């Protein structure tokens, strides 16, 4: 990480940009989604995943955060709660770094407590209407896949998966 990652991250930071090619390189090395089995993911244990995160963190915390959100939050949500069709579509492309995920749980008045969350969703023709506020969504400015937590009309916690194209609608 010191020799390969550091110079590129310094350049990206100087230019105030997120270098997606670094993310894709992480994917080509099997880092993104490392502990997930199948779907193009490496399927390594959590100690190995932690060591990868530690080495990235030694160079830059923001890229380590982006790596961790992709793997531990966005991809894990799809792996645990997504349909087989969603897993087959999203997980391989996220593992390659071709799609970047984010995870929206934290709210201004509720923190990261799902029980206190105010964001709600209502099923509509062709999708959902989402109302509420989220904060600190790592990767959100560059995300292609958005995992957003909200309560449905019955107050049941729901995980909504949007693509960046759908979020613009």
Question: Could you describe each region identified by the protein language model?
Answer:
Residues 127, 131-164:
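A short core secondary-structure module
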Residues 53, 75-78, 91, 147:
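Conserved protein kinase catalytic domain
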Residues 1-68, 84-96, 100:
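Amphipathic, small/basic residue-rich leader segments at the start of a protein or domain
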Residues 64-75, 98-104, 133-146:
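FAD-binding core of FAD-dependent oxidoreductases
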Residues 119-122:
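A structural signal for short hydrophobic beta-strand segments in well-ordered beta-sheet cores
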Residues 165-169:
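A short, hydrophobic C-terminal helix/tail in secreted or cell-surface proteins
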Residues 44, 113-115, 139-143:
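Short glycine/proline-enriched turns and hinge-like loops at secondary-structure junctions
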């Amino acid at each position: 990480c010191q020799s390969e990652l550091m110079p590129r991250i310094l350049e990206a930071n100087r230019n105030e940009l997120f270098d997606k090619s670094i993310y894709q390189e992480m994917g080509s090395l099997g880092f993104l989604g490392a502990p997930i089995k199948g779907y193009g993911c490496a399927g390594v244990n959590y100690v190995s995943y932690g060591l990868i995160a530690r080495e990235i963190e030694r160079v830059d915390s923001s890229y380590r955060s982006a790596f961790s959100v992709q793997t531990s939050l966005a991809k894990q949500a799809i792996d645990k709660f997504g349909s087989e069709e969603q897993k087959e579509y999203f997980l391989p492309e996220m593992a390659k770094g071709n799609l970047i995920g984010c995870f929206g749980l934290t709210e201004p008045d509720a923190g990261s407590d799902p029980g206190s969350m105010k964001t709600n969703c209502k099923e509509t023709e062709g999708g959902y209407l989402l109302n509420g506020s989220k904060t600190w969504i790592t990767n959100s400015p560059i995300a292609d896949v958005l995992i957003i937590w909200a309560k449905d009309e019955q107050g049941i916690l729901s995980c909504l998966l949007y693509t960046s194209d759908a979020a613009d609608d």
